[in-house]
Amino acid sequence: MRHRHGLRKLNRTSSHRLAMLRNMSNSLIEHEVIKTTLPKAKELRKVVEPLITLGKKPSLANRRLAFNRLRDRDSVTKLFEVLGPRYATRPGGYLRVLKFGFRVGDNAPMALVELLDRPEVEEVEVQEAE
């Protein structure tokens, strides 16, 4: 029986899986939107949402817990100074996983993972040099 085994192995060793999810978490916190495969995106959601919940309560203990999981000072700083206050009133569901077609090489289902309530990026018009 496969009851209560809520982890996708993603065809990796445990150390590789931990490192991959840590790198993807740091990338998502830094860029606020990333493109990856659908199973990885669903696992990433289980990692990042509790981290953002930690970021809503800025205590030293929570900072240390977040640093223990992320191992990146810049990501932890952004988590507590930008993302925590942004989602202070939201009771969960900080990420959106959108299906994004299939990869060209192996037809793997792709997904776009983004943080909700991102500030809109204004497009900068490039003036041509005359």
Swiss-Prot record:
Transmembrane segments: none
Keyword Ribosomal protein: yes
UniProt GO cellular component terms: cytosolic large ribosomal subunit
GO biological process terms on file: translation
Keyword Lipid metabolism: no
Keywords: Ribonucleoprotein, Ribosomal protein
MF-aspect GO terms: structural constituent of ribosome
Coiled coil region boundaries: none
Subunit and interaction comment: Part of the 50S ribosomal subunit. Contacts protein L32.
Family from the record: Belongs to the bacterial ribosomal protein bL17 family.
Family annotation (NCBIfam families): L17
Protein name, per record: Large ribosomal subunit protein bL17
Organism: Paraburkholderia xenovorans (strain LB400)
